[in-house]
Amino acid sequence: MRIVDRESAEGRRERITLVPETLDDLWHLTYVLEPGDLVAGDTTRRIQRDDDKMRDTGGEREPMWIRIDVNNVEFAKFANRLRVGGDIVDCSREDQLGFHHTFNVEEHDELTVEKVWQVDQLERLEEAVEAAEQPDVAIATVEEGQAHIHTVAQYGVEERASITGTTGKGEYARSRDELFEELAAILRRLDAEAIILAGPGFTKQDALEHIEDNAPEAAEKIQVVDTASVGDRGVHEVLKRGAVDRIQTETRVSKEAELIDELMERIGEGEKAAYGVDEVAEAAEFGAIETLLILDERLREERAGEGDWAVDVNDIIENVEQQGGEVVVFSHEFDPGQQLANLGGIAALLRYRLS
């Protein structure tokens, strides 16, 4: 994420002009933007005309500058874009005022966001800016006859390739070198800044030697990790062991896994923990929260007025921060986020037990 400009607006509002540079940045904006925000930028809009030439075509798209009052935000992950919809409140063409418009925000599109910024939202922007300097990580898990390549992004872990084939004897057997060469070719194409090579047994070491001989530029980026499995399970082992953390100073994935494990351990032992909005709100009032854990989707719903909590989520967050606590927003894309969802979407590690 790149911040282009910041300036004060009316009331407690602030206007920030920014440029999302990666798919991760678009994902971050999903949880920054909310109904009532003002979003502006250059876009195109289909204009209906009355002349005979255009009547049958449904109008043509014209470039214009538009500001909307946001009422809908959707991250279209597989389309690589963020859809931000709302009513037009300012426009370079006055005849478009009041109509609905949707920005299809893609990487490198500049937009200006005006709103009352919550502390956690500004922290999320800062996280996105800092993430631009962190290395991308590819995880290749390998065992005899198969290899899987995943990438770790802030919005989730994504499988990028799966290679399978018989590597035994026989006319139709696929040689190990052939499988290793395809693995090396994929890693070259991904051009990740760091690679973790994992799996059971000695196959990964043989794969590393092949990559060192045939793709030395990729081999320089590799760290080897022992795991009992490959594929999704192998990736989970890599994340849980903190291998990604050693490459990226701090990743959302590994931090959330560590925190949710600590929470579940404390709950199981009846230690300093709270979960569910009622328990957490009470703990926040007493200043007992050391770390607040909240699910991104639940936070968005509550702020948009779509949730069912009887307390204001912003009050909980402000109480925690005023008492020196940490707020961690979990991604629903990861397993730890799913575990948190099962606990009501909000929980806390406490400084002391309340009862």
Swiss-Prot record:
Gene Ontology terms describing biological process: nonfunctional rRNA decay; nuclear-transcribed mRNA catabolic process, no-go decay; nuclear-transcribed mRNA catabolic process, non-stop decay; ribosome disassembly; RNA surveillance
EC number(s) from the headed UniProt entry: 3.1.-.-
Subcellular localization(s) per the UniProt record: Cytoplasm
InterPro entries in UniProt: eFR1_2_sf, eRF1_1_Pelota, eRF1_2, eRF1_3, Pelota/DOM34_N, Pelota_arc, Ribosomal_eL30-like_sf, Transl-rel_pelota
Enzyme class: hydrolase
Cross-referenced Gene3D superfamilies: 3.30.1330.30, eRF1 domain 2 (3.30.420.60), Pelota, domain A (2.30.30.870)
Molecular function in Gene Ontology: endonuclease activity; metal ion binding
Cofactor (UniProt): a divalent metal cation
Protein keywords: Cytoplasm, Endonuclease, Hydrolase, Metal-binding, Nuclease
One Pfam family per UniProt: eRF1_2
GO CC aspect terms: cytoplasm
Keyword Signal attached: no
Chief subcellular location: cytoplasm
Superkingdom: Archaea
Cytoplasm keyword on record: yes
Function: May function in recognizing stalled ribosomes, interact with stem-loop structures in stalled mRNA molecules, and effect endonucleolytic cleavage of the mRNA. May play a role in the release non-functional ribosomes and degradation of damaged mRNAs. Has endoribonuclease activity.
HAMAP family: PelO
Family of the protein in this entry: Belongs to the eukaryotic release factor 1 family. Pelota subfamily.
Notes on the domains: The N-terminal domain has the RNA-binding Sm fold. It harbors the endoribonuclease activity.
Description of how the protein assembles with itself and partners: Monomer.
Protein's name according to its UniProt entry: Protein pelota homolog
Gene this protein is translated from: pelA
